[in-house]
Amino acid sequence: MKIAVLLYPACSLQEITTLTSILCLSFGQSLDYLASENKIYTSEEGLQVIPDFTFKEVQGVVYDCIILPGTQELFVSLYDSRLISFLKNVDIKRTIVAAISSSPMFLGKAGLLRNRYYTGGLYMELVDYFSFLEKENMLHQPVVKDKNVITAIGFAYTIFSQTVLDTLGLELPSDFFLRKNFYSPEELTYHLEASDYQKILQKISQYERCIQE
């Protein structure tokens, strides 16, 4: 499976790391991080990230899924012709596009929301202002899935993650996202398999030998 995550100035990694973590750790997926330029981008959390490829370098590459985080610097990316051009070339009949928070606006400008229901963390004044955002198709719901286009409000990142995983056909245990108000000590006691424990002991031994040397 080929999956891309888009980066831009002040992108919100917090909104997508539940999803990206599950894709990598639970399903062994490798993600391509894409951006307009090959440079360091600073997320809204202050983390510095470097893309694997620029949009130009992946022209012609077909992704199974493209993930867009929100951003605090909305207009920097909205008027970035390289980002919008990349999105315009996405075939949403083949590619699942998942955008959260403010990033559905990028889909709108690229024409990917035309005649589709959507949501997002968008101010209604901006929905009124930009004609590419079809107000009659905006649903005030945490997550909206219309065929291969998934959009969400920022706080709904867990449901967003579930929806993307389901659409990709990646199944998790039914209680994976469940949280309780009380946990017994037994539920919070963890043990290794014997074979895994032996591997860890070997690794510890290697580190301890290095320190002694």
PLM region descriptions:
Residues 2-12, 21, 25-38, 47, ...:
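Active-site-adjacent pocket-lining segments in enzyme domains
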Residues 11-16, 42:
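Short N-terminal binding/cap micro-motifs at the start of the first secondary-structure element
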